[in-house]
Amino acid sequence: MAATAAVSGVLGRLGWRLLQLRCLPVARCRPALVPRAFHTAVGFRSSEEQKQQPPHSSSQQHSETQGPEFSRPPPRYTDQSGEEEEDYESEEQLQHRILTAALEFVPAHGWTAEAIAEGAQSLGLSSAAASMFGSDGSELILHFVTQCNARLNQVLEEEQKLVQLGQAEKRKTDQFLRDAVETRLRMLIPYIEHWPRALSILLLPHNIPPSLNLLTSMVDDMWHYAGDQSTDFNWYTRRAVLAGIYNTTELVMMQDSSPDFEDTWRFLENRINDAMNMGHTAKQVKSTGEALVQGLMGAAVTLKNLTGLNQRR
Protein backbone atom coordinates (compact mmCIF):
# COMPACT_ATOMS: atom_id res chain seq x y z
CA MET A 1 0.00 0.00 0.00
CA ALA A 2 2.86 2.38 0.82
CA ALA A 3 4.46 1.77 -2.59
CA THR A 4 1.11 2.41 -4.31
CA ALA A 5 0.66 5.66 -2.41
CA ALA A 6 4.17 6.74 -3.33
CA VAL A 7 3.61 5.98 -7.00
CA SER A 8 0.28 7.84 -6.93
CA GLY A 9 2.02 10.85 -5.48
CA VAL A 10 4.70 10.77 -8.16
CA LEU A 11 2.11 10.39 -10.92
CA GLY A 12 0.21 13.35 -9.50
CA ARG A 13 3.33 15.45 -9.58
CA LEU A 14 4.08 14.35 -13.15
CA GLY A 15 0.56 15.27 -14.26
CA TRP A 16 0.81 18.68 -12.63
CA ARG A 17 4.23 19.26 -14.21
CA LEU A 18 2.87 18.38 -17.66
CA LEU A 19 0.01 20.83 -17.07
CA GLN A 20 2.53 23.52 -16.18
CA LEU A 21 4.52 22.78 -19.34
CA ARG A 22 1.34 22.94 -21.46
CA CYS A 23 0.59 26.40 -20.14
CA LEU A 24 4.08 27.77 -20.88
CA PRO A 25 4.45 30.29 -23.74
CA VAL A 26 6.23 29.30 -26.91
CA ALA A 27 9.56 30.52 -25.54
CA ARG A 28 10.42 27.50 -23.46
CA CYS A 29 12.35 27.68 -20.23
CA ARG A 30 15.16 25.47 -19.04
CA PRO A 31 15.23 24.01 -15.51
CA ALA A 32 18.03 25.40 -13.42
CA LEU A 33 19.83 23.56 -10.69
CA VAL A 34 18.00 24.19 -7.44
CA PRO A 35 20.11 26.64 -5.37
CA ARG A 36 21.11 25.78 -1.84
CA ALA A 37 21.87 27.96 1.13
CA PHE A 38 25.62 27.78 0.73
CA HIS A 39 28.36 28.94 3.03
CA THR A 40 30.13 31.85 1.40
CA ALA A 41 32.72 30.73 -1.11
CA VAL A 42 34.98 33.61 -0.18
CA GLY A 43 35.86 31.86 3.04
CA PHE A 44 37.53 29.01 1.15
CA ARG A 45 39.75 31.22 -0.92
CA SER A 46 40.48 34.51 0.80
CA SER A 47 40.29 33.98 4.55
CA GLU A 48 44.06 34.19 4.97
CA GLU A 49 44.22 37.21 2.70
CA GLN A 50 41.57 38.98 4.79
CA LYS A 51 43.49 38.32 7.99
CA GLN A 52 46.56 40.04 6.54
CA GLN A 53 44.71 43.10 5.27
CA PRO A 54 44.92 46.31 7.35
CA PRO A 55 41.72 47.73 8.85
CA HIS A 56 39.61 49.90 6.58
CA SER A 57 39.95 53.61 6.94
CA SER A 58 36.97 55.57 8.19
CA SER A 59 36.35 56.90 4.68
CA GLN A 60 36.29 53.35 3.32
CA GLN A 61 33.89 52.23 6.04
CA HIS A 62 31.65 55.18 5.28
CA SER A 63 31.59 54.44 1.56
CA GLU A 64 30.62 50.81 2.18
CA THR A 65 27.46 51.87 3.99
CA GLN A 66 26.19 54.26 1.33
CA GLY A 67 24.13 51.71 -0.62
CA PRO A 68 24.37 50.04 -4.02
CA GLU A 69 25.44 53.23 -5.79
CA PHE A 70 28.77 52.97 -3.97
CA SER A 71 29.32 49.33 -4.90
CA ARG A 72 32.70 47.82 -4.19
CA PRO A 73 34.76 46.09 -6.88
CA PRO A 74 34.30 42.31 -7.05
CA PRO A 75 36.42 40.36 -4.58
CA ARG A 76 39.73 38.95 -5.77
CA TYR A 77 40.27 35.31 -4.94
CA THR A 78 43.55 33.56 -4.33
CA ASP A 79 44.07 29.98 -5.44
CA GLN A 80 46.44 27.49 -3.83
CA SER A 81 49.37 28.79 -5.89
CA GLY A 82 48.93 32.27 -4.47
CA GLU A 83 47.81 33.79 -7.78
CA GLU A 84 44.83 36.09 -7.76
CA GLU A 85 41.75 35.42 -9.87
CA GLU A 86 38.50 37.17 -10.63
CA ASP A 87 36.82 34.22 -12.37
CA TYR A 88 34.15 33.40 -9.80
CA GLU A 89 31.74 36.30 -9.57
CA SER A 90 29.12 34.51 -7.49
CA GLU A 91 28.54 31.40 -5.45
CA GLU A 92 26.28 29.95 -8.16
CA GLN A 93 29.05 30.28 -10.74
CA LEU A 94 31.51 28.69 -8.34
CA GLN A 95 29.04 25.87 -7.68
CA HIS A 96 28.58 25.26 -11.40
CA ARG A 97 32.33 25.09 -12.04
CA ILE A 98 32.99 22.73 -9.15
CA LEU A 99 30.17 20.34 -10.10
CA THR A 100 31.22 20.32 -13.75
CA ALA A 101 34.80 19.53 -12.77
CA ALA A 102 33.59 16.85 -10.33
CA LEU A 103 31.93 14.82 -13.11
CA GLU A 104 35.37 13.71 -14.27
CA PHE A 105 35.87 11.95 -10.94
CA VAL A 106 32.46 10.24 -10.68
CA PRO A 107 33.65 7.02 -12.40
CA ALA A 108 36.26 6.62 -9.65
CA HIS A 109 34.39 7.96 -6.61
CA GLY A 110 30.70 7.78 -7.50
CA TRP A 111 28.20 10.53 -6.75
CA THR A 112 29.95 11.48 -3.53
CA ALA A 113 31.57 14.32 -1.65
CA GLU A 114 34.93 12.81 -2.59
CA ALA A 115 34.22 13.40 -6.29
CA ILE A 116 33.21 16.99 -5.54
CA ALA A 117 36.35 17.53 -3.44
CA GLU A 118 38.50 16.19 -6.28
CA GLY A 119 36.71 18.50 -8.69
CA ALA A 120 37.39 21.48 -6.45
CA GLN A 121 41.06 20.58 -6.15
CA SER A 122 41.35 20.26 -9.93
CA LEU A 123 40.32 23.92 -10.09
CA GLY A 124 42.98 24.89 -7.57
CA LEU A 125 40.50 25.16 -4.69
CA SER A 126 40.58 23.60 -1.27
CA SER A 127 38.83 20.25 -0.89
CA ALA A 128 36.84 21.93 1.88
CA ALA A 129 34.72 23.46 -0.90
CA ALA A 130 32.82 20.15 -0.94
CA SER A 131 31.11 21.26 2.27
CA MET A 132 29.15 23.75 0.16
CA PHE A 133 27.03 20.82 -1.00
CA GLY A 134 24.93 18.15 0.67
CA SER A 135 26.40 14.78 1.52
CA ASP A 136 24.01 12.65 -0.59
CA GLY A 137 25.29 13.76 -4.01
CA SER A 138 21.94 15.23 -5.08
CA GLU A 139 23.38 18.46 -6.46
CA LEU A 140 25.98 16.60 -8.50
CA ILE A 141 23.41 14.22 -10.01
CA LEU A 142 20.91 16.97 -10.82
CA HIS A 143 23.71 19.03 -12.33
CA PHE A 144 24.69 16.09 -14.54
CA VAL A 145 21.10 15.53 -15.69
CA THR A 146 20.73 19.23 -16.44
CA GLN A 147 23.95 19.21 -18.46
CA CYS A 148 22.84 16.13 -20.43
CA ASN A 149 19.45 17.67 -21.22
CA ALA A 150 21.16 20.85 -22.42
CA ARG A 151 23.48 18.83 -24.67
CA LEU A 152 20.52 16.91 -26.11
CA ASN A 153 18.65 20.14 -26.75
CA GLN A 154 21.67 21.51 -28.58
CA VAL A 155 21.92 18.39 -30.75
CA LEU A 156 18.21 18.51 -31.64
CA GLU A 157 18.31 22.24 -32.32
CA GLU A 158 21.30 21.91 -34.65
CA GLU A 159 19.58 19.09 -36.54
CA GLN A 160 16.45 21.19 -36.91
CA LYS A 161 18.50 24.03 -38.41
CA LEU A 162 20.08 21.65 -40.92
CA VAL A 163 16.63 20.41 -41.96
CA GLN A 164 15.38 23.98 -42.36
CA LEU A 165 18.40 24.82 -44.52
CA GLY A 166 17.79 21.75 -46.67
CA GLN A 167 21.09 20.19 -45.63
CA ALA A 168 19.48 17.21 -43.87
CA GLU A 169 16.38 15.14 -44.45
CA LYS A 170 13.57 15.27 -41.92
CA ARG A 171 13.13 11.90 -40.24
CA LYS A 172 9.88 10.17 -39.43
CA THR A 173 8.56 10.81 -35.95
CA ASP A 174 9.19 7.30 -34.64
CA GLN A 175 12.78 7.26 -35.90
CA PHE A 176 13.40 10.76 -34.56
CA LEU A 177 12.12 9.90 -31.08
CA ARG A 178 14.03 6.62 -30.97
CA ASP A 179 17.27 8.36 -31.91
CA ALA A 180 16.64 11.20 -29.46
CA VAL A 181 16.09 8.81 -26.53
CA GLU A 182 19.14 6.74 -27.53
CA THR A 183 21.29 9.87 -27.79
CA ARG A 184 20.24 10.94 -24.32
CA LEU A 185 20.74 7.50 -22.77
CA ARG A 186 24.20 7.12 -24.31
CA MET A 187 25.28 10.06 -22.19
CA LEU A 188 24.95 7.75 -19.17
CA ILE A 189 27.46 5.19 -20.44
CA PRO A 190 30.58 6.70 -18.81
CA TYR A 191 28.72 6.62 -15.48
CA ILE A 192 26.68 3.44 -15.93
CA GLU A 193 28.33 1.60 -13.02
CA HIS A 194 27.15 4.29 -10.61
CA TRP A 195 23.85 5.17 -12.26
CA PRO A 196 21.67 2.80 -10.17
CA ARG A 197 22.84 4.69 -7.09
CA ALA A 198 22.06 7.99 -8.80
CA LEU A 199 18.49 6.90 -9.59
CA SER A 200 17.94 5.73 -6.02
CA ILE A 201 19.01 9.19 -4.81
CA LEU A 202 16.72 10.92 -7.31
CA LEU A 203 13.80 8.87 -5.93
CA LEU A 204 14.25 10.39 -2.47
CA PRO A 205 11.24 12.60 -1.60
CA HIS A 206 13.12 15.91 -1.68
CA ASN A 207 14.62 15.10 -5.09
CA ILE A 208 11.44 13.96 -6.85
CA PRO A 209 10.18 17.47 -7.80
CA PRO A 210 13.40 18.66 -9.50
CA SER A 211 14.02 15.28 -11.15
CA LEU A 212 10.45 15.22 -12.53
CA ASN A 213 10.90 18.76 -13.79
CA LEU A 214 13.99 17.66 -15.69
CA LEU A 215 12.27 14.55 -17.08
CA THR A 216 9.15 16.36 -18.28
CA SER A 217 11.18 19.19 -19.82
CA MET A 218 13.35 16.64 -21.65
CA VAL A 219 10.43 14.74 -23.21
CA ASP A 220 8.76 18.03 -24.08
CA ASP A 221 11.93 19.04 -25.94
CA MET A 222 11.92 15.75 -27.84
CA TRP A 223 8.33 16.15 -28.97
CA HIS A 224 8.86 19.82 -29.80
CA TYR A 225 11.74 19.10 -32.17
CA ALA A 226 9.85 16.09 -33.55
CA GLY A 227 7.30 18.61 -34.81
CA ASP A 228 4.43 17.85 -32.44
CA GLN A 229 1.76 20.54 -32.75
CA SER A 230 -1.08 18.82 -30.94
CA THR A 231 -3.38 20.99 -28.83
CA ASP A 232 -5.77 18.37 -27.49
CA PHE A 233 -5.41 15.62 -24.89
CA ASN A 234 -2.81 13.94 -27.09
CA TRP A 235 -0.34 16.63 -26.00
CA TYR A 236 -0.36 15.14 -22.49
CA THR A 237 -0.53 11.47 -23.40
CA ARG A 238 2.35 11.66 -25.87
CA ARG A 239 4.65 13.20 -23.31
CA ALA A 240 3.55 10.85 -20.55
CA VAL A 241 4.08 7.80 -22.77
CA LEU A 242 7.52 8.99 -23.86
CA ALA A 243 8.50 9.60 -20.23
CA GLY A 244 7.47 6.03 -19.41
CA ILE A 245 9.44 4.68 -22.37
CA TYR A 246 12.54 6.61 -21.33
CA ASN A 247 12.35 5.37 -17.73
CA THR A 248 11.80 1.72 -18.59
CA THR A 249 14.55 1.74 -21.23
CA GLU A 250 16.88 3.33 -18.70
CA LEU A 251 16.23 0.43 -16.31
CA VAL A 252 16.85 -2.12 -19.07
CA MET A 253 20.11 -0.38 -19.90
CA MET A 254 21.42 -0.70 -16.34
CA GLN A 255 21.10 -4.50 -16.54
CA ASP A 256 22.22 -4.88 -20.17
CA SER A 257 25.50 -6.73 -20.76
CA SER A 258 25.16 -7.02 -24.56
CA PRO A 259 27.78 -5.35 -26.81
CA ASP A 260 27.18 -1.61 -27.09
CA PHE A 261 23.85 -2.11 -25.26
CA GLU A 262 22.27 -3.68 -28.35
CA ASP A 263 19.48 -5.28 -26.31
CA THR A 264 18.60 -1.89 -24.86
CA TRP A 265 18.25 -0.22 -28.25
CA ARG A 266 16.16 -3.14 -29.53
CA PHE A 267 13.87 -2.80 -26.51
CA LEU A 268 13.64 0.95 -27.13
CA GLU A 269 12.73 0.50 -30.78
CA ASN A 270 9.96 -1.95 -29.88
CA ARG A 271 8.52 0.41 -27.26
CA ILE A 272 8.57 3.36 -29.66
CA ASN A 273 6.82 1.27 -32.33
CA ASP A 274 4.19 0.18 -29.81
CA ALA A 275 3.57 3.79 -28.80
CA MET A 276 3.26 5.01 -32.39
CA ASN A 277 0.78 2.23 -33.19
CA MET A 278 -1.53 3.15 -30.35
CA GLY A 279 -5.02 4.22 -31.33
CA HIS A 280 -6.36 7.57 -30.19
CA THR A 281 -8.91 5.91 -27.95
CA ALA A 282 -9.54 5.22 -24.30
CA LYS A 283 -7.15 2.29 -24.68
CA GLN A 284 -4.37 4.80 -25.26
CA VAL A 285 -5.10 6.58 -22.00
CA LYS A 286 -5.12 3.27 -20.15
CA SER A 287 -1.83 2.24 -21.76
CA THR A 288 -0.32 5.58 -20.79
CA GLY A 289 -1.11 5.04 -17.13
CA GLU A 290 0.11 1.45 -17.26
CA ALA A 291 3.40 2.53 -18.86
CA LEU A 292 4.02 5.11 -16.16
CA VAL A 293 3.13 2.79 -13.31
CA GLN A 294 5.27 0.04 -14.82
CA GLY A 295 8.21 2.40 -15.12
CA LEU A 296 7.95 3.83 -11.62
CA MET A 297 7.25 0.52 -9.88
CA GLY A 298 10.01 -1.12 -11.90
CA ALA A 299 12.36 1.65 -10.85
CA ALA A 300 11.61 1.08 -7.18
CA VAL A 301 12.12 -2.70 -7.38
CA THR A 302 15.11 -2.66 -9.71
CA LEU A 303 16.94 0.06 -7.84
CA LYS A 304 16.44 -1.80 -4.60
CA ASN A 305 18.26 -4.75 -6.16
CA LEU A 306 20.91 -2.79 -8.05
CA THR A 307 21.92 -0.10 -5.57
CA GLY A 308 25.40 -0.73 -4.31
CA LEU A 309 26.42 -3.07 -7.12
CA ASN A 310 29.58 -2.05 -8.94
CA GLN A 311 29.36 -4.34 -11.96
CA ARG A 312 26.80 -4.77 -14.70
CA ARG A 313 25.24 -8.16 -15.12
Swiss-Prot record:
Keywords: Acetylation, Lipid-binding, Mitochondrion, Phosphoprotein, Transit peptide, Ubiquinone biosynthesis, Ubl conjugation
Any GO molecular function: enzyme activator activity
Ranges of Low complexity composition bias in the record: 52-66
UniProt cross-references to InterPro entries, sorted A to Z: COQ9_C, COQ9_HTH, Ubiq_biosynth_COQ9
Coiled-coil boundaries: none
GO cellular component, one term: mitochondrial inner membrane
Residues that, per the record, bind a 1,2-diacylglycero-3-phosphoethanolamine: 239
Span list, region Disordered: 44-93
Predominant localisation class: mitochondrion
Subcellular location: Mitochondrion
Pathway, per record: Cofactor biosynthesis; ubiquinone biosynthesis
Acidic residues: compositionally biased ranges: 81-92
Keyword RNA-binding: no
Organelle targeting peptide span: 1-45
Residues bearing PTM N6-acetyllysine: 170
Biological process terms in GO annotation: mitochondrial electron transport, NADH to ubiquinone; ubiquinone biosynthetic process
Residue window of motif SIFI-degron: 17-32
Stored Pfam families: COQ9, COQ9_N
Location of Phosphoserine modifications: 81
Processing and modification events after translation: In response to mitochondrial stress, the precursor protein is ubiquitinated by the SIFI complex in the cytoplasm before mitochondrial import, leading to its degradation. Within the SIFI complex, UBR4 initiates ubiquitin chain that are further elongated or branched by KCMF1.
Function according to Swiss-Prot or TrEMBL: Membrane-associated protein that warps the membrane surface to access and bind aromatic isoprenes with high specificity, including ubiquinone (CoQ) isoprene intermediates and presents them directly to COQ7, therefore facilitating the COQ7-mediated hydroxylase step. Participates in the biosynthesis of coenzyme Q, also named ubiquinone, an essential lipid-soluble electron transporter for aerobic cellular respiration.
Family membership: Belongs to the COQ9 family.
Domain comment, as recorded: Structurally similar to the bacterial FadR protein (fatty acid metabolism regulator protein).
Assembly: Homodimer. Heterodimer; two heterodimers of COQ7:COQ9 come together on the same side of the lipid pseudo-bilayer and form a curved tetramer with a hydrophobic surface suitable for membrane interaction. These two tetramers assemble into a soluble octamer with a pseudo-bilayer of lipids captured within. Interacts with COQ7; this interaction allows ubiquinone (CoQ) isoprene intermediates presentation to COQ7 and facilitates the COQ7-mediated hydroxylase step.
Protein name in UniProt: Ubiquinone biosynthesis protein COQ9, mitochondrial
UniProt source species: Mus musculus (Mouse)
Source taxonomy: Eukaryota, Metazoa, Chordata, Craniata, Vertebrata
